[in-house]
UniProtKB/Swiss-Prot annotation:
Glycans are attached at residues 87, 349. It comes from Oryza sativa subsp. japonica (Rice). GO terms for cellular component: endoplasmic reticulum; endoplasmic reticulum lumen. Its EC number is 5.3.4.1. GO terms for molecular function: protein disulfide isomerase activity. This is Protein disulfide isomerase-like 1-3. The keyword Repressor does not apply.
Length: 545
């Protein structure tokens, strides 16, 4: 079976390399940096949905002395421990809180993270109690099972292991040294920090300046509501900051007459704060998730927006995006109309994003958008997409209305149909795929490839050999389509490159993974012209796969 690169081409639609100043919660891919595991030397880009989960971290109580006695001491001069399958259980079992990076030596993003991670480890050694950072080469054969156990799908993946390894979560913090230190110090403490009734105004100021902060207000710090709040804080602490108090008057926009119990979520967007008095744990989680996310996500260079951007692209629902120049004289008018559309149609499971064209270059390349068509509205649904180029502010609401009513025609990305197509391996594009493959009445072997994929480059001469060998058979076509430059119809499940499908003249569509010219020719010979349901097709597919 051919090894495959993930089907999503580079670059991802978020900033590809944040500056030191902008490396906040951005993990250019855990959506990252997040390249999926791949062949050494070929850094495979993870898809947008690849969406590795980011979660939490917390208190560490083991003394650093235990670390010095562990069999896997860090290399001389290194603060980061080096672990492997042989000592992982022993070292993790000696700590109530330990941070582990799963990396690959050939991964460029891992190499960028390394000095920041090392600096953070050195700084956290003096924390009371010390916070331990470790690393595992997940690409080494010895450690592949270990990586699988911890759900590693991309490099680097950082995991937080608690209670001597009994619980683990993905790291959800910044990737610069200072950010790592601050995040882990906070996570190593209690899930929610108490704000004393006698707190000075700076306590309120810190809440106002900390992004989304969830504050529980209680008559006393006990009872079922308080316990429910603390349980949710423990579960969601990776993504949100939690505080609690018995005096609402110390809070921003506080009111000493409010006695609680209630939860007040502060945020730097939309209505600035919102309250809830439902302490059912599931309901409280949903309240925090929905209220703590902007009605419209902003795609710009601000570090504060990166975590919302990541969550936006992780979401599997329909996405509506407005791209324009934020320096445009009418930018505010566009914002107003787009926010109105979001307020009207968010209930239709549509999430909204407004992006500055300068900051969104990755998105333009990823989605095949054209800067010359800005301002534009781009809607990405599960199996189709829609583009409204050079849109006017007053056209935004009607366009969204048409989409929700199902009257818009989908946009199909396609390269131009070749004027000359006389090579042994024929070129197929989205606009002529049905004609060449499904409606030609011929037996067609179609490869979906990516120009940057090394595995595809190795397959190319093999397909050329097959095409030349079968050139005298007018009923056989060997073809290829660039899956990064053309939309792939839902008839095909292309999850990696190369992907091959054989469509027989009898109407059978079969996935195939031949390795050699001989195998591919034999497969085509056995299956060409077969009718649906014929035994030869079923048996030959079993033989080949």
């Amino acid at each position: 079976m051919w090894p495959r690169a993930p089907a999503t081409p580079p670059p991802p639609p978020w900033p590809s390399k944040p500056s030191a100043a902008s490396r906040s919660a951005l993990r250019r891919l855990d959506l990252d940096d997040g390249r999926r595991q791949g062949t050494e030397g070929e850094e495979n880009h993870a898809p947008l949905l690849c969406s590795p989960a980011m979660a939490s971290s917390t208190a560490f109580a083991a003394a650093f002395a235990l670390l010095l006695l562990a069999s896997s001491a860090a290399a001389e001069g290194e603060a980061v421990l080096t672990l492997d399958a042989g000592n992982f259980t022993e070292v993790v079992g000696a700590h109530d809180f330990i941070v582990v990076e799963f990396y690959a030596p050939w991964c460029g993003h891992c190499n960028q993270l390394a000095p920041e991670y090392e600096a953070a480890a050195a700084a956290l050694r003096s924390h009371d109690p010390p916070v331990v950072l470790a690393k595992v080469d997940a690409s080494a054969d010895l450690n592949r099972g270990l990586a699988g156990e911890h759900g590693v799908q991309g490099y680097p993946t950082i995991r937080i292991l608690r209670d001597r390894g009994a619980r683990s979560h993905n790291y959800a913090g910044p990737r610069d040294a200072a950010g790592i230190v601050a995040y882990l110090k906070r996570q190593a403490g209690p899930a929610s920090v108490e704000i004393a009734a006698s707190a000075s105004p700076p306590a309120a100021d810190s809440i106002a300046n900390d992004g989304v902060v969830v504050v529980g207000v209680f008559p006393e710090l006990s009872g079922s509501e308080f316990e429910s709040f603390m349980a949710v804080a423990e579960k969601m602490r990776a993504d949100y900051d939690f505080r609690h108090t018995t005096d609402a008057g110390v809070l921003p926009r506080g009111d000493r007459t409010v006695r609680g119990p209630l939860v007040r979520l502060f945020k730097p967007f939309d209505e600035l704060f919102v309250d809830s008095q439902d302490f059912d744990r599931d309901a409280l989680e949903k309240f925090i998730e929905s209220s703590g996310f902007p009605t419209v996500v902003t795609f710009d260079t601000s570090p504060a927006n990166q975590k919302y951007l990541l969550k936006y692209f992780d979401n599997a629902g329909t996405k509506a995006m407005l791209f324009l120049s934020f320096s445009d004289d009418r930018a505010e008018e566009f914002r107003t109309q787009f926010h109105e559309a979001a307020n009207q149609y968010s209930a239709n499971n549509i999430s909204f994003l407004i992006g500055d064209v300068t900051a969104s270059q990755g998105a333009f390349q990823y989605f095949g958008l054209k800067e010359s068509e800005v301002p534009l509205v781009f809607i990405l649904a599960s199996k189709s997409k829609y583009i409204k180029p050079t849109v006017e502010p007053d056209q935004i609401l009607p366009y969204l209305k048409e989409f929700t009513e199902g009257t818009l025609a989908p946009h199909v990305k396609s390269e131009p149909i070749p004027e000359v197509n006389d090579q042994p391996v024929k070129t197929v594009v989205a606009d002529n795929l049905r004609e060449v493959v499904f409606n030609s009445g011929k037996n067609v072997l179609l490869e979906f490839y990516a120009p940057w994929c090394g595995h595809c480059q190795k397959l190319a001469p093999i397909l050329e050999e097959v095409a030349v060998s079968l050139k005298d058979d007018e009923d056989v076509v060997i073809a290829k389509m660039d899956g990064t430059a053309n939309d792939v119809p839902s008839d095909f499940a292309v999850e990696g490159y190369p992907s091959m499908y054989f469509y027989s003249s009898g109407g059978n569509l079969l996935p195939y993974d031949g390795r050699t010219a001989e195998e591919i020719i034999d497969f085509i010979t056995k299956n060409k012209g077969s009718r649906p349901g014929e035994a030869t097709t079923t048996e030959s597919v079993k033989d080949e796969l």
